[in-house]
């Protein structure tokens, strides 16, 4: 899949889909907003935020 720009609820929904039952760590301080909203990120990068 190509890199995507994901912000706000779209970003949270993507994490729910990717991480599933593992859950995820969503904190603006983790850099996920800079990585995935201000820039673009891959599904592989999103998976780094799963628990």
Swiss-Prot record:
Transmembrane segments: none annotated. This is Insulin. Disulfide bonds join 7-37, 19-50, 36-41. GO terms for molecular function: hormone activity. SMART domains: IlGF (SM00078). Insulin decreases blood glucose concentration. It increases cell permeability to monosaccharides, amino acids and fatty acids. It accelerates glycolysis, the pentose phosphate cycle, and glycogen synthesis in liver. Heterodimer of a B chain and an A chain linked by two disulfide bonds. CDD domains: IlGF_insulin_like (cd04367). It comes from the Eukaryota. It is found in: Secreted. One of its GO terms (biological process) is glucose metabolic process. InterPro entries: Insulin, Insulin-like, Insulin-like_sf, Insulin_CS, Insulin_family. One of its GO terms (cellular component) is extracellular space. The keyword Secreted applies. Keywords: Carbohydrate metabolism, Disulfide bond, Glucose metabolism, Hormone, Secreted. Belongs to the insulin family.
